């Protein structure tokens, strides 16, 4: 089923979903299963699987020189999606990126998704590489998420990039996109950012999942302004529990989000990461309860490869 069909079938009941990241090369997929297993009791209708873009590494050539190589540290997104779909009988949502992929490579991945019965995808621009000042698309790739959405929507209409053919089995992808309650870090204003979101929806996006936030008022204001701009698709809140002290620094730095003073003060009073983790769980529980009471369609959790805190939260909310 499509994500939007799951939402419609729930008839106003808030659903539970979460996002996982592929293991690094050389690690076992069993690690993923071990993190997914405790969360299945909450009956997620779908699970997101991230995609990592290529990055540069330096390999010792053995003569005092280093070779700069392009590699992907966490491949396997589509294989993991197929494996989870088969093992747990749950829909999966692979993330598709503009960065690091040509339009042709994107089309081939979409064809694979279609053959595997995967009919939900998340369309994202992706981040700049570590040695780039700003995002640079791969030659022949999509520049923006709206362009990627348009390409997927073209395939839904039976139109391939270069081939003219009779299509008797069209794809029918449900397309998710990202929304930013505190605006994208590159956007000059929230209004400008909402215009970009409207472009993605107009290009064919079916639902929105927000970046993490820690103040529900910002989500509610974001939804209000999105509706005023004519964005009518479901807007799913994304929740990330604080887990370690360094989150106070790196989350605002990386995602350009604000942390409430009450949360900062609570974390700073903690003596160790176990206490911080519990503060994060309790904060996310209160966020989730309020959002659920407001009738959000889905509560979507960013697990970052760890499920115990998500399980604790879900046990108090669902």
Regions found by a protein language model. Name each.
Residues 102-114, 192-196, 221-224, 244-247, ...:
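Catalytic cores of alpha/beta
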Residues 103-150:
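Flexible, glycine-rich active-site loops centered on histidine and acidic residues
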Residues 126, 139-186, 193, 224, ...:
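Active-site pocket-lining/capping segments in soluble small-molecule metabolic enzymes
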Residues 19, 47, 113, 200, ...:
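Conserved, mostly hydrophobic/aromatic
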Residues 1-49:
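Conserved N-terminal beta1-alpha1 strand-loop-helix module at the mouth
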Residues 15-33, 91-104, 174-192, 268-282:
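Active-site mouth loops of central-metabolism enzymes
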Residues 42-75, 126-140, 205-221, 304-306:
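Glycine-rich, proline-tolerant flexible connector loops at the mouths of alpha/beta enzymes
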């Amino acid at each position: 089923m499509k994500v939007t069909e799951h939402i419609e079938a729930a008839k106003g009941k808030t659903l539970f979903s979460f996002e996982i990241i592929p293991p690094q090369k050389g690690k076992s997929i069993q690690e993923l299963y071990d993190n997914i297993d405790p969360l299945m009791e909450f009956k997620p209708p779908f699970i997101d699987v991230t995609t990592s873009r290529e990055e540069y590494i330096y390999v010792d050539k053995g003569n005092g020189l280093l070779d700069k190589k392009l590699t992907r540290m966490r491949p396997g997104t589509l294989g993991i999606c197929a494996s989870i779909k088969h093992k747990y009988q749950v829909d999966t949502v692979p993330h598709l990126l503009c960065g690091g992929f040509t339009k042709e490579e994107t089309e081939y991945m979409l064809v694979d998704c279609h053959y595997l019965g995967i009919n939900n995808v998340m369309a994202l621009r992706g981040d700049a590489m570590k040695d780039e000042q700003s995002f640079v698309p791969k030659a022949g790739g999509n520049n923006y998420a709206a362009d990627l959405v348009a390409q997927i929507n073209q395939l839904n209409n039976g139109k391939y990039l270069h081939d003219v053919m009779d299509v008797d089995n069209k794809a029918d992808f449900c397309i998710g996109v990202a929304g930013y309650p505190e605006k994208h870090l590159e956007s000059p204003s929230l209004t400008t950012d909402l215009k970009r979101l409207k472009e993605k929806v107009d290009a064919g996006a079916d639902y929105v999942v927000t970046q993490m936030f820690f103040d529900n008022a910002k989500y509610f204001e974001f939804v209000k302004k999105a509706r005023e701009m004519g964005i009518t698709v479901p807007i799913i809140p994304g929740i990330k529990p604080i887990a370690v002290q360094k989150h106070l620094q790196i989350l605002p730095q990386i995602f350009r989000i604000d942390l409430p003073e009450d949360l900062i003060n609570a974390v700073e009073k903690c003596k160790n990461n176990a206490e911080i983790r519990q503060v994060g769980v309790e904060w996310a529980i209160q966020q989730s309860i309020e959002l659920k009471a407001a009738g959000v369609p889905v509560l979507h959790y960013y697990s970052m490869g760890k499920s115990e805190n998500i399980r604790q939260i879900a046990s108090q909310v669902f």
